[in-house]
Amino acid sequence: MQGLVNSFNASHPHIVVQASSGGTSTGDLLPKVTTALAAGTAPDVAYIYGSYAANIAQSGKTVNLKNIIHTPGYNWNDFYPASQQIVAPGGKVIGFPALIDNLSVIYNKKLFAAAGVPVPSPNWTWDQFRAVAKKMTNPAKHIYGVNYPTGGDTLDTSWRFFPGLWQRGGQILSPDHKKALFNSPAGVANLTLWQQMATVDHSVYLDPTAEKAEPLFTSGHLAMFVSGPWEVPVLNQAKVDWADVPLPAADGSHQTVSGPDNWVIFNNGSARVAAAITFLEWLTAPQQELTWMMGSGSLPIRPSILKLPGYKEWLKKYPGIGPMAQNLVNAKEAMPTLPQWPRVVDALGNGIASVLLGRAAPAAALNQAAQQADTILNVPGGG
């Protein structure tokens, strides 16, 4: 990032950008930004997880770019739809998209070859996915077909449920965010498939911490790994012979889920806001984004980046990542952005885990989670 900041400062002599990490991890930023907001010392721009967007917007200290993003120069519609939705909680555009990812199915090519099982097809279905996971499970060799997190992070447990829900025509919440809809027939069918895989086929590694599936995959004990582009450096460093395909389809849809993050602009006066907009408009332009991608291994936040000459160099630097970038076209919907979202996710994630662990039936667990979510959603004041 510092190199990009230096380039911007050199080409924009009337604006000086100072970069700061803000914390040891991105997760550390929210409490620091929240503290700064309370003290009246908010930064001009901060990198904020998309799941925090609604809470940050509630502060009253963010800008609203809604009236300017479609003017010439911003190329707003060149951002992927999920990113556009996440940066606009409640319809208020609080900044610019910063990062996008998605879930796909990563598989161990050597394990498939050894088992004599054809590798997954990009056009596969959930029934085929179940059959492949069952075939690849080998208790004698301690090999599981696929993973699903049941502990450690309820968001991780929940967001793997959303693609199958959307693919079957379901929704997470009502349009007004007052009622949970994830317990629809689409949701029950989706969770029932995973329940059968976990409790009947015994083909699913139920990860109790959401951190054990990765080493299980790199050590050759997990045939298929439902994860995302953040795994690419780890897999290549571990010299795993891997490839990836989109998530299986229901009704012909391979829709996936994405967790976009944002560059949020805080209102520190019109001059500083204008400077922040100029910087982020420049930073998120295709060529600068490609430079960032080369150093970070992140996916393109704009489809137009895939057409740049330097894109092929990015593909060479991060072997295997190309299909994950192509899979962004399947990230069509975003998770809701509202202050109560973390608590809704807790209710849903705990319900899903109870089913996969054999402690509850899909419909009953989803109905209970929906009742809890409805109560949370209708509490005045939100989160």
Residue ranges and their predicted role:
Residues 1-61, 70-77, 91, 119, ...:
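Conserved N-terminal structural module of periplasmic/extracytoplasmic solute-binding proteins
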Residues 10, 115, 181, 192, ...:
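Extracytoplasmic/periplasmic substrate-recognition and gating elements
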Residues 44-47, 223-228, 243:
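Paired acidic/hydrophobic, glycine-rich loop segments that form the ligand-binding mouth/hinge
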Residues 48-103, 157-160, 241-245, 310-317, ...:
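Hinge/lid segment of periplasmic solute-binding proteins
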Residues 63-79, 121-122, 144-155, 168-189, ...:
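Short, solvent-exposed loop/beta-turn-alpha elements that line the ligand-binding surface or hinge
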Residues 82, 294-347, 354, 379-380:
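Long, aromatic- and glycine/proline-rich binding clefts that accommodate carbohydrate-like moieties
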Residues 89-98, 103, 127-179, 186, ...:
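Extracytoplasmic/periplasmic solute-binding protein
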Residues 132-135, 176-206:
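Glycine-centered hinge/linker elements that transmit conformational signals in sensory
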